[in-house]
Regions:
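Generic structural signal for residues positioned in beta-strands
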Residues: 2-4, 77-79, 104-105, 150-151, ...
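Surface-exposed, flexible loop/turn segments at secondary-structure boundaries
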Residues: 11, 85-86, 160
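The catalytic-center signature of Zn2+-dependent metalloproteases
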Residues: 114-184
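Fold-level signature of zinc-dependent metallopeptidase catalytic domains
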Residues: 1-14
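Metzincin-family zinc-dependent endopeptidase catalytic domain
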Residues: 15-131, 143
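Short, histidine-centered active-site or binding-site loop motifs used for metal coordination
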Residues: 7-9, 110-112, 156
Length: 184
């Protein structure tokens, strides 16, 4: 069983962030028999039509569909982009997932400390790990959790992301174990 991590590059997806995400996902999901690999980066030139110049953002579902194109041979594929994403009815999204597509995408744009005039560069890695674990949880059948420190708690703002942990609470972990039992 494999999880792929696909960099979808608008300008730059930092290698150190990809490495941190890969290491954490691998450390956690290896207990279920998953191997994690980083795929070669891809540009978004073929889905640039999803860019809304008025908002300065990309429509996230097209990024998700591009990630899903790489799912063959993988149990899940996680896209990581530097593009600022949104969905209709929302100002922005940190990420998006679809369990039927076995695909998820996270956006680093609003996870960056400089977006909030913060200085701590290491916080980007922590935030990216949390959002990656959250979206992979959705891919593997988890819903949002009411526990504010569970990684599956919905992040309405960066404050929520910073507050929650980077792992699943006991309830979500048990549900994840059941969902992954017998998976090949």
């Amino acid at each position: 069983m494999r999880i792929g991590i696909l960099p979808l590059v608008v300008k730059e997806v930092e290698k150190n962030v990809l490495k941190a995400v890969k290491e954490h996902v691998e450390e956690f999901y290896s207990r279920f028999g998953f191997k994690v690999e980083t795929l070669p980066p891809e540009t978004v030139s073929d889905i640039f039509f999803s860019y809304n110049p008025i908002r300065g953002q990309f429509l996230g579902r097209f990024f998700l569909m591009k990630v899903a194109e790489h799912r063959e041979g993988f149990s899940a594929v996680l896209g990581v982009t530097d593009g600022d994403l949104y969905e209709e009815g929302m100002n922005f999204i940190f990420g998006l997932a679809n369990p039927y597509l076995k695909a998820a995408i996270i956006s680093l744009a609003r996870l960056r400390p400089e977006f909030y005039n913060e200085k701590d560069g290491e916080v980007l890695k922590e935030r990216a790990i949390k959002e990656a674990m959250h979206e992979l949880g959705h891919v593997f059948g988890l819903a949002h959790c009411k526990n504010p420190i569970c990684v599956m708690h919905f992040s309405n703002s960066i404050i929520d992301t910073d507050y929650k942990g980077k792992n699943y609470c006991e309830r979500c972990l048990n549900r994840l174990k059941r969902n992954l039992e017998g998976r090949e």
